[in-house]
């Protein structure tokens, strides 16, 4: 897995005929048109929980609204100056129904950096507290968390984002892209990425390749049965290779942490608003 600073280096290697590399799916640029590798343009506002995380007007990552004041994303998307855009379909222009919030707290999972497996993006999950709650509308909705730790391999799920639609060459779409991909078994996932997969991860993709999340999609949702089953984390570069599925953070492993973290911060704010007792 390459950190952001080395994404360009791995891109250069791939263009010159080098072997595939593992890469986090984070990007700091935005561009023209296309679709998620092997995917299609989402029907506008059909993914109302989808968030876009921008820094100085440039796409960094995706995210997912899990509470009117909280967005879930990948821990490796941590960066100063994040702004969260919700109710978006097309980036680069103001749209009716969109809402924008600054981030007041970024809370990566406490084991993300401390864990011996952190170099493999173990515990790659982060909560973002928004400056104020968003208003839920037809364009903006929360997505329920999955409590199911093991869905059947082969289950079709949907991943979405504004990441590059081609790989290794890059092409960033103006509109939100979707791809329907299948869950892979834990055994297959560990065979593909020996020594790198933990119980906190899952794999999804297609045998034939061509459908995948890619750079710029990090932190976005993998939706299975209308619940948040995974968070885009990392995978091989170039994206969409046959038998090289993308790797996602397994959300069901973190439901308790998500709920306790939100409850903790909400309680602290209530105490502050009440003042000294």
UniProtKB/Swiss-Prot annotation:
Q: Which UniProt keywords apply?
A: Disulfide bond, Glycoprotein, Hydrolase, Protease, Secreted, Serine protease, Signal
Q: Which residues form the active site?
A: 76, 124, 218
Q: What is the lineage of its organism?
A: Eukaryota, Metazoa, Chordata, Craniata, Vertebrata
Annotated compartments: Secreted
Matching PANTHER family, A to Z?
KALLIKREIN-13, KALLIKREIN-RELATED
Q: Name one GO biological process term.
A: proteolysis
Could you give one GO CC term from the UniProt record? cytoplasm
According to its UniProt record, this protein's enzyme class is hydrolase
Q: In which tissues is it expressed?
A: Expressed in prostate, breast, testis and salivary gland.
Q: What's this protein's family per the entry?
A: Belongs to the peptidase S1 family. Kallikrein subfamily.
InterPro entries, per the entry: Peptidase_S1_PA (IPR009003), Peptidase_S1_PA_chymotrypsin (IPR043504), Peptidase_S1A (IPR001314), Trypsin_dom (IPR001254), TRYPSIN_HIS (IPR018114), TRYPSIN_SER (IPR033116)
In the UniProt record, the signal sequence range is: 1-16
Query: Recorded E.C. number(s)?
Result: 3.4.21.-
Coiled-coil annotated residue ranges, if any: none
Q: Which residues form the Peptidase S1 domain?
A: 36-263
UniProt GO molecular function: hydrolase activity; serine-type endopeptidase activity
User: Carbohydrate attachment sites?
Assistant: 30, 225
What's a Pfam family in this record?
Trypsin
Q: Spell out the protein name for this chain.
A: Kallikrein-13
Q: List the disulfide bonds.
A: 42-178, 61-77, 157-224, 189-203, 214-239
Which domain of life, per UniProt?
A: Eukaryota
Where is it mostly found? secreted
């Amino acid at each position: 897995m390459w950190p952001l600073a080395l994404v360009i280096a791995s891109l250069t290697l791939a263009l010159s005929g080098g072997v595939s590399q593992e890469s986090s799916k984070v990007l700091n640029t935005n561009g023209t048109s296309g679709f998620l590798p092997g995917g299609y343009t989402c029907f506008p506002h059909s993914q109302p929980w989808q968030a876009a995380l921008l820094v100085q007007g440039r796409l960094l990552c995706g995210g997912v609204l899990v509470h009117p004041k909280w967005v879930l994303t990948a821990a490796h998307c941590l960066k100063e100056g994040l702004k969260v855009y919700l109710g978006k379909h097309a980036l680069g222009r103001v749209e009716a129904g969109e809402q924008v919030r600054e981030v007041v707290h970024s809370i990566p999972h406490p084991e993300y950096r401390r864990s011996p497996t952190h170099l493999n993006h173990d515990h790659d999950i982060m909560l973002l507290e928004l400056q104020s709650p968003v208003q839920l509308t037809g364009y903006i909705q929360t997505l329920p968390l999955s409590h199911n730790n093991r869905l059947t391999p082969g289950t079709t799920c949907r991943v979405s984002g504004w990441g590059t639609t081609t790989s290794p060459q890059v092409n960033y779409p103006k509109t939100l892209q979707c791809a329907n991909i299948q869950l892979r078994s834990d055994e297959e996932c560990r065979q593909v990425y020996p020594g790198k997969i933990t119980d906190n991860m899952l794999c999804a993709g297609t045998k034939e390749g061509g459908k995948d999340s890619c750079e710029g999609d990090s932190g976005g949702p993998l939706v299975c049965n209308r619940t948040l089953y995974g968070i885009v984390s990392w995978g091989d570069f170039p994206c969409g290779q046959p038998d090289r599925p993308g790797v996602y953070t397994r959300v069901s492993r973190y439901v308790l942490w998500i709920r306790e973290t939100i409850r903790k911060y909400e309680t602290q704010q209530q105490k502050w608003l009440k003042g000294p007792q």
